[in-house]
Amino acid sequence: MKKIRITASLLLLILIFVSCGSSNAAVKRLQQTEEGVSSPTTIDEYKEAIAKYEKRVADITLANEQIGIWYKILGSRYIDLKMWGEALSCYQKAIEYYPENQNLYYYVGVCAGYMAHSALDYDATGSTTKKYNYLKLSESAYLRAIAIENRYVRALYGLGVLYVFELDESEKAIPYLKTLLTIDTGHTDAKSVLANAYFRTGDFQASAAMYDSIIKTTKDKEKKALAEANKKIALDAAYGR
């Protein structure tokens, strides 16, 4: 019985491979019929065949480019609806077509960050692995975006927020936020996150100085009042009050 089962399995595998081979051959014959190319022999026939197949390749390339764009647009639609998981899937697919597009990685970072918030421990196992994995995906996506475009302000800011408020790795946030502020010196929110990072790492003077910068430059009354309150907290910590 064992030999019969093995023989039957081998026959099934052979049939599958033959079927795949037949399918590929059928596709090839269809392509040849569509292009009017069968078995070129002369120089002119080879040139004509190459030209026809190059056009087919160009058409496929154009279609792939459009598919990537549509995935990106669909992802943005899902973001508008706050459907972060669906959006994340779309941006991951878009990256398959545009692997060097920093914006796609940025949005993966954003979506993964939101997905981390919804990754609840529904089985009550006490595990935070799923949440942590989403946060690490967000980190790697932001880092990839910055690797492609090192002056990408939104990715620098997103990474800073992630390190300070989600991963509790404020020391890692500081260089990225400082870089951001050399690019956009008036980025008040980045100053606030950097001040927070300084405070969490024990550099209270630097934290107070950053809050002071916000106080001097912002026109937003609420942000100014918050910076004044936080500056006092930082100075009190610096002088042990």
Regions found by a protein language model. Give the residues of each.
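N-terminal leader/linker segments that initiate helical-solenoid repeat arrays
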Residues: 20-77, 81
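Helix-start (N-cap) detector for alpha-helical repeat units in TPR-like alpha-solenoids
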Residues: 68, 102-103, 153-154, 188-189, ...
